[in-house]
Amino acid sequence: MSDFFELTNRGTRSYAAGKKFGVLDSRNGLMAISEGFRPIKDRYDLVVEHVADINFSPIDHNAGYEALYASERKCDCFLHTNSRRTLVFVEIKHKYTSADLDSAELNDFLDQHRDVTKESVAADEWIDDVIDQLESTITRFKTLNPTELTYYPCVNWAVGANSRIRDGVEFSIANKQDDFYLRTQFELLIRNHISIPSDPPPSNPVHLSLDELKSLIS
């Protein structure tokens, strides 16, 4: 995974070097996205492997422990929410050269890999909600100018631990005073359905105002 992005937050680079996975850190409510992450030049579809509630102690909750856990799970990478409890495991399943997969194809793709969630009923239900949300969200994102989206793989609406997303009601957002990061792991999938420059500039992620964010998800 270090072939795709480096991790610099709180010394995670030393843990990520040479590994096949990466740790996306949101312990302070924000992903480590300002520096150290390389833009993904190829398009990858990430599939949720498992959602698990794990009680990290302040000592255990560090990049090394998380990287070890991801390694044991044989995950390519994982995200966790600011709640410090729910981990959303994702696995790189496919690389697509086409940005035109429709929601039905994506649905079929996820269904093919749904067996990885059978150990968790909650995860299986959560996948259903992901599919439902994607079907409506992909259409919206196709209408956006690609420059309005960040090019970083870790930018996302916070999902996973949020019960609202499991109920398919609304997206969660991460509050940073008056600014909001467009934060959703859906973007990791959605980016395969829109036109994105093949070599995006290594700039800071896009910041959106609350009104701008609401306009995107309303």
Locations of regions flagged by a protein language model:
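Basic, amphipathic N-terminal segments that precede the first structured/catalytic domain
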Residues: 1-72
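Short acidic, S/G/P-rich loop/turn micro-motifs used as interaction or catalytic elements
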Residues: 69, 95-99, 163-167
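Catalytic centers of nucleases
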Residues: 70-80, 130
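Negatively charged, Asp/Glu-rich surface segments that serve as flexible interaction/assembly modules
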Residues: 72, 85-87, 126
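Conserved catalytic cores of phosphodiester-cleaving nucleases, focusing on short active-site segments
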Residues: 77-79, 86-95
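A solvent-exposed, charged loop/short amphipathic helix patch at secondary-structure junctions
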Residues: 94-124
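Nucleic-acid nuclease catalytic cores
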Residues: 121-128, 138-173
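Short, low-complexity, polybasic intrinsically disordered segments
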Residues: 156-218
